[in-house]
Regions:
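Helix-loop-strand module that forms the ligand-binding subsite of alpha/beta enzymes
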Residues: 1-64
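Glycine-rich phosphate/pyrophosphate-binding loop and the adjoining helix
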Residues: 59-104
Length: 104
């Protein structure tokens, strides 16, 4: 997951994902078949483009992408942490769906 800055994941996360997924792809697809879910936390907007960018790493690595009942995003500021009821419900559903995939 990522906080959203300027409608994109932060640079440190992108650099990490670039290195990790490049290394995995050159060593026989280490992440192939492993389920994954992207999550974004933002104040107002930019979460969709952030989730899209993170999901591309999963797609290119042949990883099943686990979804929820809505976009995997939370709308909170640091001082309001945990107050986004719809976002919290979305995360709970995402957790249930991830468990269901992992138990198969």
């Amino acid at each position: 997951g990522s906080p959203v800055y300027f409608a994109a994941p932060n640079g440190a996360l992108c650099a990490l994902l670039d290195r990790v997924f490049y290394a995995a792809s050159t060593h026989g697809g280490l992440f192939k078949g492993k389920p994954a879910a992207a999550v974004a936390s933002c104040m107002r907007s930019g979460a969709n483009s952030t989730i899209d960018r993170i999901n591309k790493y999963f797609s290119f690595s042949e990883m099943p992408i686990v979804s929820s009942n809505y976009w995997n995003m939370l709308f909170d500021t640091q001082s309001q942490m945990g107050t986004d009821e719809k976002g919290n419900k979305t995360m709970q559903t995402l957790g249930y769906n991830m468990v269901a995939i992992l138990q198969k």
